[in-house]
Amino acid sequence: MKATIVIPNINGKGWLKDSIESVYAQTEQDFELIVVDNGSTDESLEQARGYCTRPNFTLIENGYNTGFSHAVNQGIARARSEFVVLFNNDAFAE
């Protein structure tokens, strides 16, 4: 696996799904995608759960907001590749 993409999320309903879809739309598919949800109260957690059957997708659910840095570190700790790419939940891969 070439890279791990970590997306910390809290209440990203308006962007998260498009961000995830932009990653899966890439021609290079040798990656894993980790979304770390920090206690979202909108529908973004449910959006992320919809991807749990996708290959190389991991969802970490925190029941409360642990903070951005902690969420990023959780994602990095679960990474299985040498390289980690940090995405915000409103970032889109082109």
Which residues does each PLM region occupy?
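Cell-envelope/extracellular polymer assembly enzymes that use nucleotide-activated donors
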Residues: K2-T4, E32
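Active-site beta-to-alpha loop of glycosyltransferases that engages the nucleotide-sugar donor
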Residues: I7-D18, E28, G39
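A conserved acidic beta->alpha catalytic loop
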Residues: S22, D37-E46, Y64
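Short, acidic, metal-binding catalytic loop of nucleotide-sugar glycosyltransferases
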Residues: S22-D30
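Short beta-strand/loop segment that forms part of the nucleotide-sugar
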Residues: F31-G39, T58-N62
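Acidic donor-binding/catalytic loop of UDP-sugar-dependent glycosyltransferases
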Residues: E43, A91-E94
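Glycine-rich, basic loop-to-helix element that forms the pyrophosphate-binding segment
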Residues: E61-A79, N89
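Short aromatic/hydrophobic "clamp" motif used to bind/position activated sugar donors
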Residues: V84
